[in-house]
Amino acid sequence: MSAVQPGQVHLSIVTPEQVLFDGPVEWARVPLEDGLIGIWPGHDSLIATLGPGEVEYLAGGEVARLGVESGHLRVTESRCVVMVSLLAGEGEA
C-alpha cells in the first residue's frame, strides 16, 4: 500500500470477494443515488448509497473507471471507501 501524499486521498474499492483498488488518488468521482459526487482531500465525512454509473479516479497521472450498480460509500478527511455490492454487468442473464 502506497503512502498518501499531501493533495491525495486514500481510495479503497472493495467487493465482498476482493479488493479492486487500494491506494492514493488525486480525486475520485462516485455515482450516488441522487447524482455524482467528487471526492477530494479534506472532504467532509459522509456515508451514502451508490447509484448505477462509473466510479472514476485519478491515480498516478491516469484516469481509471469502474462500472458499478449498487453499494455504499464512506468518506473521511483522508480516506474514501467504495463498498460495491454489484459491479456493472453482473447479475445479467
Task: Place the predicted regions along the sequence by residue.
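Compact, glycine-rich, soluble single-domain proteins
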Residues: H10-A93
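N-terminal export/targeting signal detector
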Residues: M1-H10
